[in-house]
Swiss-Prot record:
Residues that, per the record, bind Zn(2+): C302, C304, C307, H333
Cofactor note (record): Binds 1 zinc ion per subunit.
Protein name (record): Queuine tRNA-ribosyltransferase
Xref: InterPro entries: ArchSynthase1/Queuine_TRR (IPR050076), TGT (IPR004803), TGT-like_sf (IPR036511), tRNA_ribo_trans-like (IPR002616)
Organism, as annotated: Dechloromonas aromatica (strain RCB)
Lineage: Bacteria, Pseudomonadati, Pseudomonadota, Betaproteobacteria, Rhodocyclales
Amino acid sequence: MQFDLLKTDGVARRGTLTLAHGVIQTPVFMPVGTYGTVKAMTPQSLNDIGAQICLGNTFHLWLRPGLEVIAAHKGLHDFMNWQKPILTDSGGFQVFSLGAMRKITEEGVKFSSPHDGAKLFLTPEISMQIQKVLNSDIVMIFDECTPYPATHEEAAKSMRMSMRWAQRSRDEHNKLENSNALFGIVQGGMHEDLRDESVAGLCDIGFDGMAIGGLSVGEPKEDMARILAHTAPQLPTHKPRYLMGVGTPEDLVYSVSAGIDMFDCVMPTRNARNGHLFTRFGDVKIKNARYKLDTGPLDSSCSCYTCTNFTRAYLHHLFRNGEILGGMLNTIHNLHFYQTIMAEMRTAIEVEHFTEWAAGFARDRSSGQ
């Protein structure tokens, strides 16, 4: 892996990230393909909307279809027919989400399969072994996502165990001779001093890139902004910075202004399937009756397949009738919109016009339909 920082505008960064399956232009948004598929999108559709890299979910792919199936395809790329880079998360967040179904110990996490109730055990070592089989370009360490809210004592205990798991992840990744990139994950809840301790510890261990975890887990926006603004500047300048699970278009712009390079979130795809569409001039809830006779495009400024071929009335009709095509067209648009935002930010940073671009984007988004 190689990361090249090409340009800065204020704190915003423009770079390239060279991985085994291609070169990524940053800042970048990564669509989420939990089960080896971005819901309602074909690999060709992902290419068409400009996706450079997508996510797979270690936890879910381990359970279904299982490693034997993916190993038979020599990894996730051939299995899902996506020859661009893939990042896989470690399974930590999914285990965290199981709540009462799991028990966290120093060794790892014991839990019951959400599919058949089978007793399972996931450790940093097993997570690294799974991700080696998946052959993802970027591997994430196994950590505990600190819940919100958490007291200082609770967050410290969680973060320090994640730090020990980070070392075990690093050791196993090396032992497996996995040549793909390994990213550390900063934890520490809403406590700046714990975030500082986490960054320092991860830097001592040594990782190819650094992620900020434990945000967008239910905390107020002000807390997320506070922790992001505090933590991002401390991350190594010469390594990619990844903000996990974020977020809205406005979140992306704010986070790029804080120095983040990489993002993922289910929001554009999940919202699309629920009829919540992002446009340049505000959000559209396509089920609303006001769109029944609307013969205009969803977003007059958008060049995606949906906006250049179909009316709001048609999208309204599809959604109201539960047609599969509705979810597909909505998802194409939302992901295209996110990719367009990222491309515009990259250009704005290149020409040192980011602040002006961000102000214009905010004006457009708040102007309404």
